[in-house]
Amino acid sequence: MPRAPHSMPLLLLLLLLSSLPQAQAAFPQDPTPLLTSDLQGASPSSWFRGLEDDAVAAELGLDFQRFLTLNRTLLVAARDHVFSFDLQAQEEGEGLVPNKFLTWRSQDMENCAVRGKLTDECYNYIRVLVPWNSQTLLACGTNSFSPMCRSYGITSLQQEGEELSGQARCPFDATQSTVAIFAEGSLYSATAADFQASDAVVYRSLGPQPPLRSAKYDSKWLREPHFVYALEHGEHVYFFFREVSVEDARLGRVQFSRVARVCKRDMGGSPRALDRHWTSFLKLRLNCSVPGDSTFYFDVLQSLTGPVNLHGRSALFGVFTTQTNSIPGSAVCAFYLDDIERGFEGKFKEQRSLDGAWTPVSEDKVPSPRPGSCAGVGAAASFSSSQDLPDDVLLFIKAHPLLDPAVPPATHQPLLTLTSRALLTQVAVDGMAGPHRNTTVLFLGSNDGTVLKVLPPGGQSLGSEPIVLEEIDAYSHARCSGKRSPRAARRIIGLELDTEGHRLFVAFPGCIVYLSLSRCARHGACQRSCLASLDPYCGWHRSRGCMSIRGPGGTDVDLTGNQESTEHGDCQDGATGSQSGPGDSAYGVRRDLSPASASRSIPIPLLLACVAAAFALGASVSGLLVSCACRRANRRRSKDIETPGLPRPLSLRSLARLHGGGPEPPPPPKDGDAAQTPQLYTTFLPPPDGGSPPELACLPTPETTPELPVKHLRASGGPWEWNQNGNNASEGPGRPPRGCSGAGGPAPRVLVRPPPPGCPGQAVEVTTLEELLRYLHGPQPPRKGSEPLASAPFTSRPPASEPGASLFVDSSPMPRDGVPPLRLDVPPEGKRAAPSGRPALSAPAPRLGVGGSRRLPFPTHRAPPGLLTRVPSGGPARYSGGPGRHLLYLGRPEGHRGRSLKRVDVKSPLSPKPPLASPPQPAPHGGHFNF
């Protein structure tokens, strides 16, 4: 394997350092608020929970539903009531007390409970509250899951006319979404039209034009939508919502933010297609995402504002969050209205197969006039009514309501992203803040009860990053909790901005509260603190100090600050950011660092980059050191292996010397000659030239290596016990039992293998490890190639015992698995015993063409390789080999003969030493081999 160059760690380090700033720029960090505050010490009249004599409100709270501001009157829709607040009276210092209210209770609560609904769900929740005209108000409520609508006078809040059906105008359940708006005398509503909320509908009614609706149960039009906002603009009515995506259904239930529109002049289709349905319904995706190589999307629309001036163009501000099962995060994106209108001129998308991807439709397949166009205007100007449109246009718009591409954000990236805080839920925008009415301020509500006041990028700060001016904890558990869970009770579900009254109304499920847009009095007489807050609602007055700015400011308000002017009183050091108390003149200010403090501060990204660089550098240096150490150790180990003449216990070369065969070892190399390393890996097949087998052909293999004995292991007896090789079948009726020879001594069982050419025919009995080591490292006398090998006669060997004899053994300790140490014996030269009818278990497979009596596949003049065979206990077995060849026997001491023998395969040793011939000596009886 090629080694990595030493410069690779440095390249990886440079790549890491170069990627850190890009990663930081790709995903902005959460800004830190300059000022934090809460409503502790605020007047109790700042909250409104409901009527004091309402027992249900005392238990459940307000159950807020919707805000509506008309003619300096704030209308609050809630459970069973609509409250009216005079904003002029509130501005004069009165508390949050309604001057009028209407009560509309459900008369069908008993039937609602019979349907299996809870009592808390059977109240009349006012979900729709829109002005019908300048004098009349339309209110629709759930009415115990039987929605109804009424009209009321705006000033008197008295009912006018009869009740109307609320189906397709108001949802059945208070938890279902709905939006509604009047345009040219007709009510455009979007909600669920049935009890199960399975029929989502965009509906037009209550006007001079015929009622129209969206396609029923068609997921291409609407798929489980959650409607957020409705807007009339130009010739169209726009609906903003989120729904389960149809183009990415393979990813699961992924929600996308959408905007759909219909023509106000739409009269429906012909009887052949889209009769009493919209012929101009189109929708496209709103893209709020962080750009980069891998785009990070905020797909779930939570709230949207009306048109606000942004950089001289009309824009909508929306709050978006991530998917419910994704990393929690929120973002604020703005969309220009002209970009939205331009998006509806994009390409149509279609799905050509059931599991295929959605792709744009080529322009040559789009009929004319362009589907979705308003009749009498633009491309369909030649058609006076939508009912006159061609059928192919109507059928195409029915099957292709989705457009491509998505609408990009106004600044091509979010104005604000938050990933380490609670999720944003609501947004309100003041596009005319400050003394010159040219500053945009965002007010954001979250699901933990906090309100953020934010300057978007490019505002007063003239920077590219948003500035969180203030973070306010607006929730009060004592006033707003009710019977809800703490998490649900803290969620902000409504924001209403009163710029003339310099107030922000915040709605929780159980109450509403109003906040001042600024807290300039906290800066007191500290000019530096007042100006460092960057609050467009605060300014410095020479005589009155830091004061609130409402409307255009006079010449006596200093906005930039005169550094030479005298500061009134002591100022807290803005660099510390400490908050000693509400009375502090610079309570909570964290800006306007002094030059010395700014020079001493270290940016967090730079600190992280330094830590990563130090870690990478240390890892690379450690890797180099470890690599050098391992390389040196390998070089030293290879040098030790190549050095001849050093004794080593039981090394591969020692075994090769012990068991090797063939010619004498070569003489030591001369000076300058490289040492010849013997070949360690060789084959067991004979060489093609018919010569001697390789040097290591007699090396033992893992199968031939005997196992060490175990101390004090007794053999278990039984009538069905077999030996280790399973070959204790009957060997003849006339043979004595196993373990007893004819002379009264134990009969040994041996494994025999003919030696390969060049291997000695004699062996050395080795019973201890010390003897083996002495033999390995002892002197090597010269070999006598023609010296006859001494052998001991085997005529006195007793016959094999009966199969059942091995079942009864003495109680002496046995070696491991009942196998005593092996001994090398010399076979007799006499007559060989008849071969057993059972083939040797250690014989090779017939496929190899070797073994006892099988036909050899190679020429007979070539000596076959030495193989292992089994010899019965009664005498030596037949072995393959010519005359003059000797066998290698594996014997066992006398004291352990007759016991079961574990199968082992031992190859013949090839040793350059002259074999030490010794006849087998009987081991003393009762000898134990406990190692």
UniProtKB/Swiss-Prot annotation:
Sites carrying a glycan are 71, 287, 438
Q: Provide ranges: composition bias, Low complexity.
A: 693-708
The alphabetical list of record keywords is: Cell membrane, Developmental protein, Differentiation, Disulfide bond, Glycoprotein, Membrane, Neurogenesis, Signal, Transmembrane, Transmembrane helix
Region of interest: Disordered: 556-591, 655-747, 777-931
Chief location category? membrane
Residue runs in coiled coils: none
Q: What Gene3D superfamilies does the record point to?
A: ligand-binding face of the semaphorins, domain 2, YVTN repeat-like/Quinoprotein amine dehydrogenase
Spell out the protein name for this chain: Semaphorin-6C
- Stated role: May be a stop signal for the dorsal root ganglion neurons in their target areas, and possibly also for other neurons. May also be involved in the maintenance and remodeling of neuronal connections.
Question: Which ranges does the record list as Cytoplasmic topological domains?
Answer: 627-931
Q: Where is the composition biased (Basic and acidic residues)?
A: 893-906
Q: Which organism is it from?
A: Mus musculus
The answer, when asked if Lipid biosynthesis is one of the entry's keywords, is no
Q: Name one GO biological process term.
A: cell differentiation
Pfam families xref list: Sema
List residues in topological domain: Extracellular. Answer: 26-605
Q: Which GO terms describe its cellular component?
A: plasma membrane
Topological type in the membrane = Single-pass type I membrane protein
A GO molecular function assigned to this protein is:
semaphorin receptor binding
SUPFAM superfamilies xrefs? Plexin repeat, Sema domain
Disulfides per UniProt: 112-122, 140-149, 263-374, 288-333, 480-511, 520-538, 526-571, 530-546
Residues covered by the Sema domain: 31-517
